[in-house]
């Protein structure tokens, strides 16, 4: 028996189909393409059928691709949207998730584990790969804005992650926000890289 092989890579154009397999396997044009934080709300609304996929493809061609895909034995199983906070319009304009200081952090805004692969260790590899991507790009720290649920969360809001998940990945609470997810307050958690 061979040991499991885990890899995480930025979602460059050549890995776009793997990203889509995780986040939107059926390729539904109006389904989530992880754009709501990356584009202005009016831009997202104006995108017609098929345009959301194209908008995400364009983001994958930028200097900082918009996230990472984790593979288990060659199969894409996880997605993490991460990038410099300064390049994420919804965060730069947010009155609910304000910067805690002037450190030019990278921000985790979405974590998705593909159906059929949850509770198999994907998240640990995914977050470690996301942090490595940020560190390799010169980020001094990575932030996330999870919740601290008393039990299991509704899957539709679980993309923000949980305090426990980020603590296991070496993050610590550095502040609070005025934002909520699934009715729960969101925290500011950080992992320093320098």
Model regions and ranges:
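Conserved N-terminal entry element of GNAT/NAT acetyltransferase domains
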Residues: 1-38
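Active-site rim helix/loop that mediates acceptor-substrate recognition in acyltransferases
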Residues: 33-67
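Conserved acyl-donor/pantetheine-binding loop and adjacent beta-alpha core of acyl/acetyltransferases
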Residues: 46, 58-62, 71, 75-118, ...
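Short beta-strand micro-motifs in enzyme catalytic cores
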Residues: 66-68, 104, 183-189
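Conserved acetyl-CoA pyrophosphate-binding loop and the N-cap/start of the following alpha-helix
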Residues: 117, 121-129
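Conserved GNAT acetyl-CoA-binding A-motif
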Residues: 127, 134-157
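C-terminal "cap" of GNAT-fold acetyltransferases
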Residues: 157-164, 168-169, 175-194
């Amino acid at each position: 028996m061979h040991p499991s092989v885990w890899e995480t890579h930025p979602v460059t154009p050549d890995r776009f189909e793997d990203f889509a397999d995780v986040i939107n396997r059926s390729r539904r044009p109006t389904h989530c393409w992880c754009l709501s934080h990356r584009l202005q709300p009016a831009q997202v609304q104006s995108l017609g059928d098929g345009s959301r996929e194209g908008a995400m493809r364009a983001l994958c061609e930028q200097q900082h691709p918009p996230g990472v895909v984790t593979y288990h034995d060659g199969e894409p199983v996880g997605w993490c949207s991460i990038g410099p906070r300064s390049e994420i319009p919804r965060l730069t304009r947010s009155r609910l998730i304000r910067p805690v200081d002037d450190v030019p952090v990278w921000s985790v805004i979405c974590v998705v584990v593909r159906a059929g692969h949850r509770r198999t260790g994907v998240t640990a590899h995914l977050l470690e790969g996301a942090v490595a991507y940020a560190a390799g790009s010169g980020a001094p720290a990575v932030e996330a804005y999870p919740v601290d649920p008393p039990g299991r969360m509704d899957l539709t809001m679980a993309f923000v992650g949980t305090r426990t998940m980020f603590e296991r990945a070496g993050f610590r609470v550095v502040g609070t926000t005025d934002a909520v997810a699934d009715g729960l307050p969101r925290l500011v958690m950080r992992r320093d890289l320098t």
